[in-house]
């Protein structure tokens, strides 16, 4: 495992350096550090997963993304790539601004939107950002609740973990997260692409509006499938059942589990007023 020590100076391909200040967090792919880059605080994602460290294709795609630049302001896009060193590499990005919450915190009710306007603004900003990404010929490939930072007061949305973005039709071996992957990926029929992005986007939008997961109702809760790939295929593949399916009731919400008030109500008049304002503003 290639961890960095506090005070380590990391060389970047643009001829500059960044200096590690502290660890911010870690996950399956690597560790995120706070760094000094050009005299300002930034973040450095440093890979520890061997399949990424040893992938020349992943490194090349990451470098290409840096050179191409961000497709929209909502993306916390890679700013600079580290030269391979100290047994690994990584990339520099902006830090998350204050006032933003992980999308997962909304699902857990640890964060709440101030109003419906902010809630729908988050949805529309995310849609607009991915529309631009797809228009430039990219696909995101691994969209899930861990990719979004949202301001609960305004609904302003930021998109992180953009190292998996690649030209549509090209894949670095990333499949996605259970519950967010399109059925055709779950069933092994295709790799992620812009069309499977649409499915993942729909799941994320449903969660942001209703604060519940669209395929995790009574049927899902009755099936212990954490280590059963075949059962996972049934629950999230072509046999999946929408939690609000009008004809199949086996996966309906469960009282005592699906308690978020948005599950049963979202003001239609508020939605209509917001969408009218959105159209009139000429949001680009």
Question: What residue ranges belong to the model's regions?
Answer:
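Conserved catalytic-loop aspartate of Hanks-type protein kinases
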Residues: 197
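Conserved activation segment of eukaryotic-like protein kinases, specifically the C-terminal portion
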Residues: 171-188
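Conserved C-lobe activation region of Hanks-type protein kinase-like domains
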Residues: 205-271
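ATP-binding glycine-rich phosphate-binding loop
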Residues: 2-39, 71
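Activation of the activation-loop gatekeeper triad in protein kinase-fold domains
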Residues: 160-166
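Conserved beta3-strand ATP-binding lysine motif
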Residues: 45-49
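Conserved structural core of kinase catalytic domains
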Residues: 73-122
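Catalytic-loop of the protein kinase fold
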Residues: 130, 134-152
